[in-house]
UniProtKB/Swiss-Prot annotation:
Keywords: Acetylcholine receptor inhibiting toxin, Amidation, Disulfide bond, Hydroxylation, Ion channel impairing toxin, Neurotoxin, Postsynaptic neurotoxin, Secreted, Toxin. GO terms for cellular component: extracellular region; host cell postsynaptic membrane. Alpha-conotoxins act on postsynaptic membranes, they bind to the nicotinic acetylcholine receptors (nAChR) and thus inhibit them. Expressed by the venom duct. This is Alpha-conotoxin-like Reg1e. The keyword Chaperone does not apply. One of its GO terms (molecular function) is ion channel regulator activity.
Length: 12
């Protein structure tokens, strides 16, 4: 998921 990706984590 997004929350595990450092590039996308900010969206969580």
């Amino acid at each position: 998921g997004c929350c595990s990706d450092p590039r996308c984590r900010y969206r969580c």
